[in-house]
């Protein structure tokens, strides 16, 4: 017999009167035309900091095309194992003005090409055991803290520019001051409510040229930056740099 409590799975052997406790690391993947429908190229979404195994929120920033033949699906494993879900398998909510979801032959698609922050909420319930809500938000990335002059809010003056295509880089404004770099997304619903939670629950940095997400971990090692430098992020390749 197995039960899940929070982030742990407990397996009980009644016959031998033993038990085993194993930490569970729930995941979510996105596959579609933008990943060539190849699970080896699928985007692994980032878990919010306070997820549990049965309920949680996951996010990623990705570029997708518009309409038919540009669809995508999600799954909790990187495989065609029957757990994947598309247009009919989730509640779809757009928080982007003028952008709507469309049915691409059972796949999820949007009616305007571009960069989006995709947010998937997994909730225990429903006929299959889980319900899913797929959200889209504008892909807002912010500089927080010392390097923007000490601000700890969603300041539009400290928002990254968004590239025109899938190969481009998100670029920060020139940093205002020397200090520890803090980067995050902080998606808000159409009603202005925090979708994930506080900014640190969806923060990230980069090390050795690779974007590294905090996810469910603790404080990350610090990256120090100089005034005048800019941050460059490529969410397609996962590469990043500071110069």
Q: What would you call each of these model-derived segments?
A:
Residues 1-243:
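Insoluble glucan recognition modules
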């Amino acid at each position: 017999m197995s039960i899940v409590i929070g982030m742990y799975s407990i397996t009980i052997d009644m016959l031998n009167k033993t038990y085993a406790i194993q930490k569970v690391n729930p995941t979510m993947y996105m596959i579609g035309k933008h990943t060539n429908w190849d699970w080896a190229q699928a985007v692994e979404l980032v878990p919010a900091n306070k997820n549990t195994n049965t309920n949680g929120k996951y996010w990623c920033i990705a570029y997708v095309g518009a309409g038919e033949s540009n669809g995508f699906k999600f799954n909790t494993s990187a495989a065609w194992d029957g757990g994947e879900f598309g247009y009919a398998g989730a509640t779809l909510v757009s928080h982007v003005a003028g952008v709507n979801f469309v049915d691409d032959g059972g796949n999820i698609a949007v009616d305007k090409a571009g960069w989006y922050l995709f947010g998937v909420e997994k909730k225990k319930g429903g006929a299959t055991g889980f319900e899913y809500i797929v959200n889209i938000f504008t892909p807002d990335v912010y500089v927080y803290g010392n390097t923007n002059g000490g601000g700890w809010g969603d300041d539009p003056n400290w928002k990254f520019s968004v590239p025109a295509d899938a190969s481009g880089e998100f670029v920060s404004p020139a940093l205002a001051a020397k200090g520890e770099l803090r980067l995050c997304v902080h998606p808000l619903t159409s009603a202005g409510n925090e979708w994930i939670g506080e900014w640190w629950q969806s923060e990230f940095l980069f090390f050795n040229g690779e974007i590294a997400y905090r996810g469910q971990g603790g404080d990350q090692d610090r990256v120090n930056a100089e005034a005048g430098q800019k941050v460059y992020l490529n969410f397609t390749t996962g590469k990043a740099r500071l110069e």
